[in-house]
């Protein structure tokens, strides 16, 4: 248990940040799932539009520190390749 006032404050702050970060990661996952759903349906135009919406969310996660830069780049690259393969 936290003994000092500062430690108690850090616990409160960490709980708030965890909630915000969790929501941010969930939002990123939702955008990526929309791209994957469009890919599964075979709709290249919808997939391209969904990827254009997902890209800023992915890289916003990088700038906010909830997703590693390489992870975001890898996800974006793989989705782009899958869209290109639809031809």
Curated annotation (Swiss-Prot):
One of its GO terms (molecular function) is structural constituent of ribosome. GO terms for biological process: translation. GO terms for cellular component: small ribosomal subunit. Pfam families: Ribosomal_S20p. Keywords: Ribonucleoprotein, Ribosomal protein, RNA-binding, rRNA-binding. SUPFAM superfamilies: Ribosomal protein S20. Disulfide bonds: none annotated. InterPro entries: Ribosomal_bS20, Ribosomal_bS20_sf. Gene3D superfamilies: Ribosomal protein S20 (1.20.58.110). It comes from the Bacteria. Binds directly to 16S ribosomal RNA. Belongs to the bacterial ribosomal protein bS20 family. This is Small ribosomal subunit protein bS20. It comes from Rhizorhabdus wittichii (strain DSM 6014 / CCUG 31198 / JCM 15750 / NBRC 105917 / EY 4224 / RW1) (Sphingomonas wittichii). The lineage of its organism: Bacteria, Pseudomonadati, Pseudomonadota, Alphaproteobacteria, Sphingomonadales. The gene is rpsT.
